[in-house]
Amino acid sequence: MKDSEKPFLDHLEDLRGVILKCAAAIGAGSILGVMSIGRVMEILRWPLTQAQEGLAQPAPSTLLALQVTDPMTVTLQIGIGAGILLSLPLVLVVLGQYLLPALAVRERGLLLPVFSVGTVLFLGGALFCYFLVLPKALRFFQDFNRWLGLESSWTMTSYTDFALQMLVGFGLSFELPLIMVILARLGILEQKVVSEHRRHAVVALLVLAACVTPTSDPFNLGLMFVPLYALFELGLAGMGWAERHARKQGDSLGRT
């Protein structure tokens, strides 16, 4: 029996199996993340230490735990985040196996490239934030505090929340060109229409940058908006390629 002919309850049973496999993979990755929490915290603190370089009077890079439960909360938060990241390849494979029978032949050929490019873009965005954006953002806040005559002493909860939101936000934002290409490939969105409404797109990108950035200051907003706009232009070029590719496929099918 083909997958499309399965009874509804059988589809629910398959979905239940997919959810259990994904949950097990994330759980195993979370356990590994909790077990290596010391090393993970060192990695997460690296942008903070980089922000201190070159300062005549560097601020203390030690994070504070003001609440009794702060260390446990941060450990679980980082553990789950590490679990999702470590299990992502396996989760994508399981989801792909579940979705594959329901897709047309042409759509099946797009599944692996979309997953691969999406993963690379997310990791690229997170690494861009980690090595370039986070140290500059932290340095900005330290300099601003010093200008106000304040000493920078951050809690581990506030720091990890800020760092993780920035990393995930940049990772998701870097998916923009892929989303634009997919919409063009499916015929939902046209490059010409997007190009004609570029000014509206710029406003939308500013709103997106403001939503993704944990703070509302212009400095961090700019750090998010500039790469977002570059990705938008890249996505616009990708939309043109996708439309040309779709037309070529249509012409070849028409001749046959």
Cite the ranges covered by each PLM segment:
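Membrane topogenic/interface segments and analogous intrinsically disordered interaction regions
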Residues: M1-T256
